[in-house]
Design a protein with these regions (language model features):
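N-terminal pre-domain/capping segments
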Residues: 1-134
Length: 134
């Protein structure tokens, strides 16, 4: 897949009809999901990933990336703990399932405490909600 850099939308974890419409309204064809709410406590299965991809395709959008898996998928790997080999195999399965489903990019963080940020969106100028740094 040889695609030029484009603007896409993301940073949501549920794929709703409203979000798919919003992506189109914003003039984008691409989107990513951040730690999507998919079933699985060790890995993501092909069928679930393919379902998300099919919804994107039906909306004439490209699901280009999933950013972050649950930390419990790879915390033992990050910390070098017993069970890391099993987690590594599940991560390999997740990546393969993503590829099979046609989702080309997996972004991840390498922080066992999760991503650091302010815990809740704050009310900003004009009533907008967003991250506030104090």
């Amino acid at each position: 897949m040889s695609l030029q850099m484009r603007v896409g939308l993301g940073q949501f974890n549920e794929l709703t009809d409203e979000k798919l419409i919003f992506i189109k309204q914003m003039g984008c064809d691409d989107f990513l999901m951040n730690t999507p709410k998919l079933p699985g406590d060790k890995q993501w299965e092909y069928e679930d990933l393919a379902g998300y991809k099919a919804r994107a395709d039906a909306a004439e959008l490209r699901l280009m990336a999933l950013e972050n898996v649950p930390t419990t998928f790879y915390d033992k790997i990050m910390l070098g703990q017993e069970g890391r080999e099993e987690q590594l195999q599940h991560m390999i399965n997740t990546v393969r399932n993503m590829g099979k489903a046609g989702i080309p990019i997996l972004g991840y963080h390498w922080n066992p405490n999760s991503v650091w940020r302010t815990p809740e969106p704050a009310t900003l100028r004009g009533g907008a909600r967003g991250t506030r740094f104090t």
